[in-house]
Curated annotation (Swiss-Prot):
One of its GO terms (molecular function) is ATP binding. It comes from Staphylococcus aureus (strain COL). Its EC number is 6.1.1.1. Keywords: Aminoacyl-tRNA synthetase, ATP-binding, Cytoplasm, Ligase, Nucleotide-binding, Protein biosynthesis, RNA-binding. CDD domains: S4, Tyr_Trp_RS_core. Gene3D superfamilies: HUPs, RNA-binding S4 domain, Tyrosyl-Transfer RNA Synthetase. Belongs to the class-I aminoacyl-tRNA synthetase family. TyrS type 1 subfamily. ATP binds at residue 234. This is Tyrosine--tRNA ligase.
Amino acid sequence: MTNVLIEDLKWRGLIYQQTDEQGIEDLLNKEQVTLYCGADPTADSLHIGHLLPFLTLRRFQEHGHRPIVLIGGGTGMIGDPSGKSEERVLQTEEQVDKNIEGISKQIHNIFEFGTDHGAVLVNNRDWLGQISLISFLRDYGKHVGVNYMLGKDSIQSRLEHGISYTEFTYTILQAIDFGHLNRELNCKIQVGGSDQWGNITSGIELMRRMYGQTDAYGLTIPLVTKSDGKKFGKSESGAVWLDAEKTSPYEFYQFWINQSDEDVIKFLKYFTFLGKEEIDRLEQSKNEAPHLREAQKTLAEEVTKFIHGEDALNDAIRISQALFSGDLKSLSAKELKDGFKDVPQVTLSNDTTNIVEVLIETGISPSKRQAREDVNNGAIYINGERQQDVNYALAPEDKIDGEFTIIRRGKKKYFMVNYQ
């Protein structure tokens, strides 16, 4: 008997590997299943690289199953070697605690809590911190063969360049997590990225050896790739964070709206809860009227609203429209800084005020002759307003918050002028 959720995950391309495809399907058809996904607190915010595993877990919740979200307060003190070419820098306990605080708030925005299938948030330091070294070696290490661990991709890929015993034992700690959640909270499925396959299967194997447990399964989702070969999850400014202080909702919105025609339908399937009928319609729109970018706008709206809420989405759309139309005066200083974060930053002394000299000193125009031509031809805009007077002097009101001025040359070349 097929399972509606599994069929949906397959259609979305969200299933990479399963330890027992039929076993998982039978289990989901039989009962409300408790399953988990985890993340180590390596920073004080999640980034969009974390989104897909957690959104996949949320899809299970939408179908009546109960998600456990594990934050690795214990494993985060060690460091996961999976997908890393070199040793991680160990974090202090204080830093890990600070990171957990930030991530926990974001988890509450992604999942529903307080219902009969409400999410459960756990920290693995609560049980890993209680295990003594002797207990770790006798009760757990005895059941894990070194040859078995050496066969894991996450270990093999590091042997040539070296791996510490600390990171070598990481997979055992994550295996202990699955066993603990299985016995204490009846958790039967672990969900993770494709790089977590070795850690997931280690947990199932440890349960089998320790408890004779067979009712435990693993499901991984694919690595998110872009059609141009670039790494997903990075903008020109770096990582795209879920924390609005690190990546503003406007920047977040812009990241999604700028996805290519080649990637947008896949990302609609991955990152939104829109159904097949609507996504098929958006695909048709993309094919027939790509200039409208309806699919990209929908992707940006759906993901931004889910993570930041409707008010933040409306602000992001308003900022985008104002920047597109050149109506900069309708925006606050913070909104302008967010909007022009990636444009060239130039510095100007407070003594320079003549528009031609400003253009030369900042390098916006390459020569005095060109600067005068740019102004005379109406190619220069100060904070969105055209300036055609070569004798114009920048006034205090041209400095937004007394800090910066936005100068545009031509149709699309923006510069943020900062003062010293």
